[in-house]
Amino acid sequence: MSEKNPIVGLCQKASFLISAAQVDQCPPDEGLEVAFAGRSNAGKSSALNTLTHANLARTSKTPGRTQLLNFFSLDESRRLVDLPGYGYAKVPIPLKQHWQRHLEAYLSSRESLAGVFLMMDIRHPLTDFDRLMLDWAQASQLPIHVLMTKADKLAFGAAKNALLKVRREVQQGWGDVASLQLFSAPKRQGVDEAQMVLAQWLGLLDEDEEPVGEA
């Protein structure tokens, strides 16, 4: 499916646009953009790089290194945004509070934001940060696609059970605000499905093409 998905070729042309410390430093609020969020050490940077076939996000063994909103241009009207991966114990509390305020402001006010990819470590899903993101998405009527990352760390049956359990809890707590799937960057599991969601949000799919959710 990747060969037919226009997002692949578009992402290969991606280039760094700007870093923003707060909402008023973001690029003009026009066109379409998709953001990538996740608690520190949830595999956000690896997922972003795998989906785009590019080294857009800096990966690090030290969680919590992303402290700015990093914008990447795909073309004149489409962007990807790497959101701060705060939540790690070594990140100072004032910094966490600062990013909580600015992240909420970004998610609630950004008209061009078409959706958010939320990375959850399949072994530690629905952290306080994850729940906060789901709350904000529900309040802003913003779609979220959850990647249950590091699925290769569990046996297939255990991974599917974890997915079903989290899906039930998300549906009970937040309704249909989120879709979910298994994902593994090293094994490239779930890449095609996630790329279809990304292409749909960025207006790259024909009207008769729809991403297929994982059962």
UniProtKB/Swiss-Prot annotation:
Q: Which GO terms describe its cellular component?
A: cytosol
Tell me the protein's name. Answer: Probable GTP-binding protein EngB
PROSITE patterns from the UniProt entry: G_ENGB
Organism, as annotated: Pseudomonas paraeruginosa (strain DSM 24068 / PA7) (Pseudomonas aeruginosa (strain PA7))
Q: Where does Mg(2+) bind?
A: 45, 66
Q: Which gene encodes it?
A: engB
Q: What does this protein do?
A: Necessary for normal cell division and for the maintenance of normal septation.
Key word Nucleotide-binding present: yes
Q: Which InterPro entries does the UniProt record give?
A: G_ENGB_dom, GTP-bd, GTP-bd_ribosome_bio_YsxC, P-loop_NTPase
| MF (Gene Ontology) | GTP binding; metal ion binding
**Organism placement in taxonomy:** Bacteria, Pseudomonadati, Pseudomonadota, Gammaproteobacteria, Pseudomonadales
According to its UniProt entry, one GO biological process term is:
division septum assembly
* Record-listed GTP binding positions: 38-45, 64-68, 82-85, 149-152, 182-185
